[in-house]
A protein has these predicted regions:
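Non-catalytic structural scaffold of enzyme domains
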Residues: 1-213
Length: 213
């Protein structure tokens, strides 16, 4: 059975991916590594993804591999360059950014893609991951992550769904939820917008399963 290392920078990312893996790929063995200081340090340091942050990601990945991981899935979308560096160092192992599978799927559709995040650094880093031909309309669901941190999941989902509805009004043809922690809001976004909604959780599982099959 494949052993999948799930490396998290937000505690809220743990439940969505574990639930989805248990449902869609129960044969996989899961190991979870959480360092929630990564996101906090990125948000307050002002240094961006500097050498120290890159080194932290390399150490997390090496620990996962030393523990027998056959594949690594990072679940926080604000650290793309750090994850790419890990993948370059370990070319024989599937190392996935949280959004790369969703980006590939979303890039196939026509029209403008509405991209919603609840963590502002994600909206700064993620657009560069899309091919140049993909038209993006970005939206920050302000206050949603704070609501989730306070245990108000319904408010979190409502704020994200409100942005999905606004993106539909601005002409978007489909919606992508940028963070693993947002997967729970998929149904609310579909109901509010009437548009197809992609989540990084479901797309990542499909990609990782294909790589390790």
């Amino acid at each position: 059975m494949p052993r999948i290392a799930l490396i998290h920078a937000l505690a809220h990312s743990v439940e969505p991916i574990n639930t989805a893996l248990a449902r869609d790929w129960p044969e996989a063995t899961r190991m979870n590594l959480l360092d929630d200081s990564l996101s906090a340090d990125l948000a307050r340091s002002g240094h961006g993804l500097d050498a120290a942050m890159h080194e932290r990601f390399q150490r997390l990945a090496q620990y996962a591999l030393d523990s027998g991981a056959n594949g690594i899935l990072f679940t926080c979308s604000a650290f793309g360059p750090c994850i790419e560096a890990v993948a370059r160092r370990h070319p024989s192992v599937p190392v996935l950014k949280p959004n790369e599978a969703m980006v590939a799927e979303a890039s196939v559709g026509a029209g403008t893609l509405g991209l919603i995040a609840t963590f502002e650094p994600t909206l700064r880093s993620m657009p560069a991951e899309f091919p140049a031909h993909v038209a993006l309309d970005l939206a920050l669901a302000a206050g949603a992550l704070e609501a989730l941190n306070e245990g108000d999941g319904a408010r979190h989902d409502q704020l994200i769904a409100a942005q999905a509805a606004r993106l539909r009004e601005r002409g978007c043809t489909r919606i992508a939820l940028a963070q693993f922690s947002m997967a729970r809001a998929r149904s609310a976004c579909e109901a509010a917008s009437g548009l197809p909604v992609l989540t990084s959780v479901d797309s990542a599982i499909r990609r990782l399963h294909a790589r390790l099959s």
